[in-house]
């Protein structure tokens, strides 16, 4: 398999790999995630999935196994890791390639203007990043997704991307928003001594975790929980929750 560019579609390979929910409020519903599938109605949705770490890989697995169709995956560019500092793919990219899904890895999805004091080196880097963003946006438009699902992707999405899917973008966030917006919500909940946390499925806006919440799934934090143990439990809840949310969305129940 030829090596993928950081901004193009990675060819399929046998190698390893919003809608308008109800606004968040004190009365936002909390749900218990069931192993039983939601009542199915409406056609399967075309999904673009954006995520990077292990937490996001579990939800991708659930979507691949659902009745909905994942048409492409966005993940951050391969990063150097280990003693040899070899470039390694993200957990999400590995899952995507194992499922023969195309992968996009732009450094950014924002088109950045030139700065007044821009050096030649920065100009070259900016133009390369802008080209990657333009190619990724063109590929996403061509896919005509119904919805984008985002989980710990690590890049902010500009409004042009949020507006691209027919039904908008849904985010899987591992906290009971608005508490612990942003990065590392699992660790922050444990460090603060919270008695409970959870997973929110929310409509994405241009701000950081500021969109309206469609579903809240409460998870108690046990005395024996470490960040790793709680991470795995929340990843399982998030995976089930997003499949249920897409079933509701396709049936017109998530409005």
Briefly describe each language-model feature range:
Residues 1-255:
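One-carbon transfer enzymes
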């Amino acid at each position: 398999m030829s090596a993928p560019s950081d901004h193009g579609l990675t060819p399929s390979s046998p190698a390893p790999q919003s809608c308008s929910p109800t606004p968040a409020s004190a009365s936002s519903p909390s749900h218990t995630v069931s192993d039983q599938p939601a009542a199915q109605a409406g056609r399967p949705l075309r999904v673009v999935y954006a995520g990077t770490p292990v937490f996001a890989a579990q939800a991708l697995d659930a979507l691949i196994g659902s009745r909905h169709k994942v048409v492409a995956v966005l993940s951050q560019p391969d990063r150097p890791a280990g003693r040899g500092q070899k470039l390694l793919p993200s957990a999400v990219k590995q899952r995507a390639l194992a499922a023969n899904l195309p992968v996009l890895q732009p450094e950014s999805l924002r088109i950045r203007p030139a700065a007044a004091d821009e050096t030649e080196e920065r100009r070259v880097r900016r133009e390369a990043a802008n080209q990657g963003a333009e190619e990724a946006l063109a590929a996403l438009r061509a896919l005509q997704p119904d919805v984008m699902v985002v989980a710990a992707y690590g890049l902010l999405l500009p409004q042009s991307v949020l507006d691209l899917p027919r039904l908008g973008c849904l985010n899987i966030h591992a906290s009971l928003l608005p508490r612990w917006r942003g990065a590392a919500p699992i660790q922050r909940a444990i460090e603060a001594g919270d008695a409970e946390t959870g997973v929110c499925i929310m409509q994405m806006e241009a701000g950081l975790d500021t969109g309206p919440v469609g579903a809240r799934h409460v998870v108690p934090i046990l005395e024996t929980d470490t960040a790793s143990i709680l991470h795995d439990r929340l990843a399982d809840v998030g995976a089930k929750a997003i499949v249920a949310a897409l079933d509701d969305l396709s049936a017109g129940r998530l409005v």
